[in-house]
């Protein structure tokens, strides 16, 4: 590997003080020696910054992976054993499950390597290195460019940087903007695509508490699943092959059974997906009043349609389990955001900061560049408030009815097919679409798909403003009966059944393709989604927001000292910490952990959310917990830290000061749901499943001691 030479450019990070406060912040590993090491060690870290992040030597970052693009996981054995959340592995596990072998419901533990199962599609991504390319990227743009011209120029430079650092395709290279395009860094990754399912607890352990307990504390969810990374015989990434071997890990985490006490040091490495802490007060107002309410309503509409079919048929429930869980998660999140942003008066706090910024912006030396920034932002949001609701009704229609956005892509491919003179190209297109549609058919249930399409299209037609003329005509023609319309459309479309598609391919024609009703709906709705705002309006906002962020930093008005999350590897550190007592968390003062006993208090035999294996009750009565008991004599299940996380951190390893695994992050608390916009030092918490409970579930309850034996256990 080439030695990385850091850019010695003047950057935000290099100008920061050498000590940063803990708790708040999603920090770049590249800068922790300069910015965080001293503070972390003062609070209990027993490692050096080099032991956390090193380019040329093995460090903790080599044991952390992005899991399937949306979660985090960690390597916990020399042979590539990977642990993440149950809800992160949910889709892969559901895809492997059948009514006869329902791994999702019943759980599963591979007895040996031959029983480790390959999901249809799963990968992990290792972080290799990063560097600052701000000067290079900004040298290709200027203030006279439109936003499209600017982005085109940036994209061209990104492609060059990616090519220069991919080493002929060995690595995946991503150039990412930070601080709203005021800084740029590139990231080098290596992907491994042979990842096999090793085991998971039963669903009534991995999802104990269900939607009711989601985002809540106290919590008792055994939210974990286990996989393994495989490589070719030389240790390189390779597609699935029975000849592949378990990865020989460069670095893996030791697992400790010592447990935690309140105020113990705790740090998390992971891939937080997205935060919006630099947004203006206008953004907060728009989301609370328009955007989030539409999301909540549209999510619930899709969930109700889905659940009606899931409740009638176990096979259908399996097909839709992962999609339903995703919808339910965001539904509760968005409602929690509305409540938290309102309760904490977040918009008012933003307005107070903007008043200070306005004073600075209107100073003679700043006015030319920053004088109009706040008014430009205000104008944009005034003009787009209703559009925020329209956008989310439309977005959730696409999420509910997957065939619509998929059909749009198929039409493009089939047009190429019809115009191609190459038999080889035509065969490749035909096989590719057939394979994708087969996956759709196997994961879908036609009556449910019809209702999802109909109900969310009706909601959009009834609630959105400025709907396309074609949708208004359908509403009028069918007197608002979108289920009748959907049934007719699905009967006629070439994409909705395998038989219809094969009939079309036996006699393909451009006329049939262009007149396909699903394809027509897709064209109309996707065009509306991407073209609802004028280029001038979008240009004005992007320029104003970029200047706003730059000005807030230059003026020192903002106390935020880190970039928003954007699915790049970050570190957060803090401590094990109780929540302030209230009725919501059982009015317990020292409530930083939960126990097996308090989990049994929630137990409801046969309940969809609070059932548990009968064996759990029997083992509790026998006190069959062995070495996994806490020194207080109880079995701890979950605990709290005040780390700063968001979506994408699911599955992240929570480590003590020695870098040993103490648990897995799997949720935040609803009291601090505004955390993506503003960090609440008093209430922000990370909910963690205790690694001792995880190991007990694998070893004692699951009978898979051989898996635990792979790990390095610290007694």
Curated annotation (Swiss-Prot):
Its EC number is 3.4.14.-. Belongs to the peptidase S46 family. It comes from the Bacteria. GO terms for molecular function: dipeptidyl-peptidase activity; serine-type aminopeptidase activity. Residues 1-22 form the signal peptide. GO terms for biological process: peptide catabolic process; proteolysis. Keywords: Aminopeptidase, Hydrolase, Protease, Serine protease, Signal. This is Dipeptidyl-peptidase 7. It holds the Pfam family Peptidase_S46. The keyword Protease applies. The active site is at residues 87, 223, 650. The keyword Hydrolase applies. The lineage of its organism: Bacteria, Pseudomonadati, Bacteroidota, Flavobacteriia, Flavobacteriales. The record marks 668 as: Critical for substrate specificity of DPP7. PANTHER family: PERIPLASMIC PEPTIDASE SUBFAMILY S1B. Catalyzes the removal of dipeptides from the N-terminus of oligopeptides. Most potently cleaves the synthetic substrate Met-Leu-methylcoumaryl-7-amide (Met-Leu-MCA), followed by Lys-Ala-, Leu-Arg- > Leu-Asp-, Leu-Glu-, >Leu-Lys, and >Val-Arg-MCA, while this enzyme does not hydrolyze Gly-Arg-, Gly-Gly-, Lys-Lys-, or Gly-Pro-MCA. It is an enzyme of class 3 (hydrolase).
């Amino acid at each position: 590997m080439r030695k990385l030479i850091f850019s010695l450019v003047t950057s935000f990070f290099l100008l920061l003080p050498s000590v940063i406060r803990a708790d708040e912040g999603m920090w770049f590993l590249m800068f922790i020696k300069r910015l965080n090491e001293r503070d972390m060690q003062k609070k209990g870290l027993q490692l050096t910054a080099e032991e956390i992040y090193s380019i040329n030597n093995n460090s903790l970052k080599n044991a952390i992976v992005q899991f399937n693009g949306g979660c985090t996981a960690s390597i916990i054995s020399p042979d590539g054993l990977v642990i993440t959340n149950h809800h992160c592995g949910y889709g892969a596990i559901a895809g492997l499950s059948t009514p006869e072998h329902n791994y999702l419901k019943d759980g599963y533990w591979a007895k040996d390597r031959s029983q480790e199962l390959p999901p249809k599609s799963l990968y992990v991504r290792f972080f290799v290195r990063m560097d600052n390319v701000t000067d290079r990227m900004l040298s290709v743009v200027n203030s006279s460019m439109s936003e499209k011209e600017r982005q085109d120029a940036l994209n061209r430079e990104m492609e060059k940087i990616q090519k220069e650092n991919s080493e002929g395709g060995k690595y995946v290279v991503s150039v990412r903007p930070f601080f709203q395009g005021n800084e740029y860094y590139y990231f080098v990754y290596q992907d491994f695509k042979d990842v096999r399912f090793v085991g998971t607890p039963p669903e009534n352990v991995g999802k104990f508490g269900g939607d009711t307990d989601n985002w809540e504390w106290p919590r008792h969810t055994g939210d974990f699943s286990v996989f393994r990374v495989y490589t070719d015989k030389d240790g390189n990434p390779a597609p699935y092959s029975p000849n592949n071997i378990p990865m020989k890990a460069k670095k893996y985490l030791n697992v400790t059974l010592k447990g935690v006490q309140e105020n113990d040091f705790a740090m998390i490495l992971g891939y937080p997906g997205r935060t919006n802490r630099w947004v203006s007060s206008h953004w907060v107002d728009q989301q609370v009043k328009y955007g989030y309410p539409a999301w909540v309503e549209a999510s619930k509409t899709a969930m109700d349609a889905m659940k009606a079919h899931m409740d009638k048929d176990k096979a259908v429930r399996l097909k839709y389990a992962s999609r339903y869980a995703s919808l339910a998660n965001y539904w509760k999140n968005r409602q929690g955001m509305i409540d938290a942003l309102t309760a904490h008066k977040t918009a008012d706090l933003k307005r107070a900061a903007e008043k200070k910024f306005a004073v600075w912006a209107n100073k003679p030396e700043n006015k030319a560049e920053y004088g109009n920034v706040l008014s430009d932002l205000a104008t944009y949001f005034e003009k787009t408030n209703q559009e925020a609701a329209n956008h989310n009704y439309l977005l959730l229609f696409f999420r509910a009815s997957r065939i619509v956005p998929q059909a749009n892509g198929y039409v493009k491919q089939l047009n190429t097919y019809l115009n191609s003179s190459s038999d080889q190209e035509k065969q490749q297109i035909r096989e590719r679409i057939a394979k994708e549609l087969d996956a759709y058919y196997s994961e879908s249930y036609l009556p449910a798909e019809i209702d999802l399409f109909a109900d969310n299209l009706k909601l959009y037609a009834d609630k959105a403003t400025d709907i396309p003329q074609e949708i208004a005509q359908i509403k009028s023609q069918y007197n608002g009966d979108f289920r009748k319309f959907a049934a007719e459309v699905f009967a006629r479309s070439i994409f909705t059944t395998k038989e219809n598609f094969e009939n079309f391919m036996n006699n393909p024609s451009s006329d049939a393709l262009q007149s396909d009703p699903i394809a027509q709906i897709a064209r109309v709705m996707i065009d509306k989604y991407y073209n609802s705002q004028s280029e001038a309006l979008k240009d004005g906002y992007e320029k104003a927001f970029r200047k706003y962020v730059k000005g807030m930093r230059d003026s020192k008005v903002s106390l935020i000292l880190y970039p928003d999350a954007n699915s790049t590897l970050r570190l957060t550190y803090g401590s094990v910490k109780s929540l302030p007592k209230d009725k919501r968390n059982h009015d317990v003062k020292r409530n930083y952990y939960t126990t097996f006993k308090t989990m049994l208090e929630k137990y409801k035999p046969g309940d969809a959310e609070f059932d548990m294996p009968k064996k759990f009750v029997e083992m509790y009565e026998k006190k069959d917990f062995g070495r996994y008991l806490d020194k207080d004599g109880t079995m701890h299940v979950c605990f709290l830290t005040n780390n700063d996380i968001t979506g994408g951190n699911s599955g992240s390893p929570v480590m003590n000061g020695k870098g040993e695994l103490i648990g897995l992050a799997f949720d935040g608390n609803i009291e601090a749901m505004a955390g993506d916009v503003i960090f609440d030092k008093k209430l922000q918490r990370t909910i963690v499943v205790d690694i001792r409970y995880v190991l007990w579930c694998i070893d004692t309850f699951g009978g898979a001691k051989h898996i635990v034996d792979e790990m390095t256990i610290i007694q």
